[in-house]
Amino acid sequence: QADEPVVRFADISVDIPARRIVRGSEEIHLTPIEFRLLAALLNNPGKVLTQRQLLNQVWGPNAVEHSHYLRIYMGHLRQKLEVDPARPQHLQTETGIGYRFMP
């Protein structure tokens, strides 16, 4: 099915409709904002989402000037989901533009 609700990368599976994330056999807790940010990236695999697009999707149209929020929450996601958060393989920064999810 093309609209598979579960996205898998590394040893992580993300069930977007159920808001459930599992690494191996361990469930990972994300805050609502972390989950919205991750879902926005997962729904656009391989595509760069600009900071403005992500801020608008996650925080709403009034937050487009608060890119520091985005950096903080991307750091949280990397700490929780990347094997080596300092060298992310899946949640990548496109410097000066935005972020990309690479499966």
Which functions belong to the PLM regions below?
Residues 7, 13, 84-86:
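Generic detector of short alpha-helix boundary/capping microenvironments
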Residues 18-97:
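Positively charged, aromatic-enriched patches within helix-turn-helix-type DNA-binding elements
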Residues 1-8:
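Basic, amphipathic DNA-recognition helix from helix-turn-helix-like DNA-binding domains
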Residues 9, 14-16, 101-103:
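Conserved catalytic Walker-motif region of ABC-type ATPase nucleotide-binding domains
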